[in-house]
Amino acid sequence: RSSDLEGTIVNDEYFGKIPADRLIKENGIIYFKIDGLYRSKLGLPASRATDICGSYDSSKGVLTILWCSLPETPSVYVNGQWGPQEDPFAGDVINSYNDGPVEDGSIMGPFYEIETSSPGAELAPGASLVHTQKVIHVQGKDEQLVPIVQDLFGADLNVIKTKFQ
């Protein structure tokens, strides 16, 4: 959820604009269809990213929860866009990639991924930066997962399940 934050809600142009039937931004929640059938990637900029995100696989009843550490002060992130960039430190904190066929029909997966990035940092010798990411997969019946989704994301699992039908 990112309704109280400012700036671009989601960067959805890594491989061209993500079609509206695959990306919905509604009430502070981003719904991204991740089925391994359409190559696309999105990113959440630092002004919108929170320390938690997740995905739900309704066919297997698996909720994936990803927590990450965020810096206490505003930071810059390496830009993961392909090709030359005007600002190489205008990147995203959280990304999700959905694999799918490329122009020649080949495909690596199908698969999807969710990842987080640490701030881009020029460290002096001996200095360090710690970035922590934790991933938990919870498998269960919908009635068991509903309160978890509500508590962590402020979202209704039943709405999530029907968003792309």
Task: Label each region the model flagged.
Residues 150-165:
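Short peripheral tails and domain-boundary helices/loops at the edges of structured domains
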Residues 141-152:
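A short acidic/glycine-rich loop-to-helix N-cap element
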Residues 1-128, 147-149:
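A contiguous, surface-exposed recognition patch within enzymatic or periplasmic domains that forms
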